[in-house]
């Protein structure tokens, strides 16, 4: 999380100008990289209604935390605070977008879906859901103040 920008290169099976491959569950295959640009590429490649969810999530996070750090690894956008690690990521599942709070068990109220990892909690957004921006903003603020994960 050094804040350095890395050059985005097309994925293994992607050449310049081609749409990213969609993996299992419709998750876009995006080359790893740091910064807003690669996250926007991921969001642009999210299929259908999931792209709207991705844009909404990114907007809420960026509006709430203007200095947030962004990266894509393992076909997942990550958000974190400089020097504190990563606090949130999201990716496409067949029927929903899974938002991961790495220290979600410490949030109040905790996001509703438990993980096998005791600290991790999930929030699933389905196509018909209306996004509760107030609750998400509160979770994002709380999560950004906790020690994040050093994932990469």
Regions found by a protein language model. Name each.
Residues 2-152:
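Charge-dense, helix-prone N-terminal extensions
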């Amino acid at each position: 999380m050094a804040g350095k920008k890395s050059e985005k290169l097309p994925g293994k099976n992607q050449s310049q100008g081609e749409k990213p491959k969609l993996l299992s569950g419709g998750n876009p295959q995006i080359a790893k990289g740091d910064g807003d640009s690669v996250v926007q590429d991921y969001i642009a490649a999210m299929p259908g209604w999931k792209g709207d969810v991705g844009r909404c999530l990114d907007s809420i996070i960026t509006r709430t935390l203007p200095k947030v750090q962004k990266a894509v690894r393992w076909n997942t956008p990550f958000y974190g605070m400089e020097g504190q690690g990563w606090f949130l990521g999201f990716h496409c599942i067949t029927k929903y977008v899974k938002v991961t709070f790495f220290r979600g068990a410490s949030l109040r109220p905790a996001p509703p879906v438990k993980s096998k990892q005791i600290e991790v909690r999930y929030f699933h957004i389905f196509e018909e859901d209306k996004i509760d921006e107030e609750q998400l903003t509160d979770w994002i603020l709380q999560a950004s103040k906790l020690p994040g994960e050093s994932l990469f």
